[in-house]
Amino acid sequence: MDAAARNTPGWQAELRLRFNGDIPRFLANGDVPPGEQRGRTRLIERHHKGPLVVQRPFYPEGDPCHVYLVHPPGGVVGGDELRIDVQVDAGAHALITTPAATKFYRCEGRHSSQTQELRAAGAMLEWLPQENIFYRGAEVRTATRVHVDPDSRFIGWEIGCLGLPARREHFDSGVLRLDLELWKSLRDTDAVQSSRVPVCLETRNVPIFLDRLRLTGESRARGAVWGLAGQEAVGTLLATPATRAQVDSIRELITGEPFAAVSLVDGVLVLRALAPQAEAVRKLFIAAWQRLRPTVIGREAVLPRIWNT
């Protein structure tokens, strides 16, 4: 890579979205149970800088708002920085996905980054992107942070694929730093001595799930049984609030490939999967989402239209 190319700045792309929904008047505290929204969720704020945009909102199931994120160049290279901020206000319901995989290409000495901040405040958020594909020589930092409160409902996933195994394009060089976090704001309460009425004293942001994956093309973890066990695709699905019964239900879906396990961590369902290719992980996660959605979100699953194209 020559000096001129190395000094050429990459894309600095930013996308900020905010969704708003009408809150039922009888729920003054914003505690909106599944199926109790009033009115259509609207995308009230849409700010973008650089080649990171959204298509117009879709409403295939009535009030919930379906939005598709699009990165026009079709890939991320060295020096590119992508940032996505999503805020879903009380009473709103947003489903966000992408029309295709996000491709991270060779960086030639400059890392690329993707930061995603997802916030649901008394709202419902479904984060269902296609996979990230990391090609040979990619040097990537990704961070997805989910912020929810006790009144929020969330289902989302992140899937990564090391190269394109089906085309014999392998991730045999490069550096990956992949972070996935879920934080929950908890209200410390006490009781007023005279009335024993709980009073909110303070709100604390508590980390419920923190995952750090560090890999290089030559990493021993790629083939070790304590690591990826030779698999090329890895994914994590999170859903909250969740119960032991939902964990048992999802466990019924785990048969053979992909290698997967499901657990419950402080009210968050965690489903993790490994497979030779991303398609197997994606199929499992879609099946899990279809099974979880009626109980977590309160609606039957409606596949985003873009998945059928």
Please provide the spans of the model-predicted regions:
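N-terminal, charged/glycine-rich beta-strand/loop interface patches
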Residues: 1-131, 136
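Broad gene-expression machinery/nucleic-acid interaction feature
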Residues: 12-16, 64, 81-83, 113-115, ...
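Residue-level recognition of well-ordered beta-strand positions that form the cores
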Residues: 16-18, 68, 85-87, 117-119, ...
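Intrinsic disorder/low-complexity segments
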Residues: 31-34, 187-203
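Tryptophan-centered short beta-strand motifs
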Residues: 41, 198, 205-207
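Structural motif
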Residues: 93-95, 124-126, 153-155, 235-236, ...
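Internal, conserved structured core segments that host functional sites
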Residues: 107-172, 180-181
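A structural signal for small-residue-enriched, beta-sheet-centric alpha/beta enzyme cores
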Residues: 160-190, 202-309
